[in-house]
Amino acid sequence: MKKTLKQEKIAVLLGGTSAEREVSLDSGQAVLNALLSAGFDAHPIDPKTFPVATLKEQGFDRVFNILHGRGGEDGTMQGLLEQIGIPYTGCGVMTSALTMDKMRTKMLWKAFGLPVAEMEIVTKANVGELNPSAVVEKLGLPVMVKPSLEGSSVGLTKVKRVEDLKSAVDFALKYDDTVLIEEWLSGAEFTVPVLDNEVLPSIRIVPEGEFYDYEAKYISDNTQYFCPSGLSAEREDELKQLVKQAYDVVGCRGWSRIDVMLDGNDAFRLVEVNTNPGMTSHSLFPKSAATVGYSFEQLVVKILELSAE
């Protein structure tokens, strides 16, 4: 007899060791509370202190993975869970590893003809050859400089003068060996959740500062979010189709959230994928899901159920 989900022992993986540990602890607590109140046998498991490889021996049947960032969202945890044979929520090994790398994600989208920002790539190895004026000639000013791998907008700089480019690149290289210099996308910013292959309503993000950084994302109360986003039905539809293509190209499953921006000509450009979106009280995925009738608890249960398919 196969157990029902309610009979299974469920590990909520939270915390971890990445730069986004605190956010994951918040998300994990919210997810845990939702599962408990829905009648599931759920337990908090922090890989920082608990050996995840022993989950099966400890009687766990399934994982709700709400780790954010490296070690939890980059394919390593997914690979470990595949090895020990425990089903888990969200994307698999390949997609998790790929989407953690902004550069390679964008290159794949570009190869499939999907729109992304123009960019230059700098590595620790070739930073000595960086020619700021040539970069600015190609991309214009301002530009956005960011580490390829770190999540939660750590290490970002908006560069407005060619003289400031080198120091911004050096700053980003503290967080990663590969840095992207991208053309500045001056239009509105959107984030679009996908749940079980259904694209949910987009959310428009209006940060208080010039871009959506760690402060705006997690600390500031002045970042504004609009859902519905204010796009015309036609443009919302265009955005939905683009996001679904982007989701499919990188091989997402279960749930993910895709960030998109408008450029100066009002054209959509894909930015990145979050394979384990935040699930705190003010997170964006639940905000959007609420507009189509999901309570937070229903959303959490749905994500868990998708891991069983």
From Swiss-Prot:
Cofactor details (free text): Binds 2 magnesium or manganese ions per subunit.
GO CC terms, sorted: cytosol
GO annotation, biological process: cell wall organization; peptidoglycan biosynthetic process; regulation of cell shape
Disulfide partners: none
Highest taxon of the lineage: Bacteria
Cofactor or coenzyme needed: Mg(2+); Mn(2+)
Listed SUPFAM superfamilies: Glutathione synthetase ATP-binding domain-like (SSF56059), PreATP-grasp domain (SSF52440)
Domain ATP-grasp: 106-305
Keyword Cell wall biogenesis/degradation: yes
Binding site for ATP: 136-191
Binding-site positions, Mg(2+) 2: E272, N274
Catalysed reactions listed for this entry: 2 D-alanine + ATP = D-alanyl-D-alanine + ADP + phosphate + H(+)
Family (UniProt): Belongs to the D-alanine--D-alanine ligase family.
Name listed for the protein in its UniProt record: D-alanine--D-alanine ligase
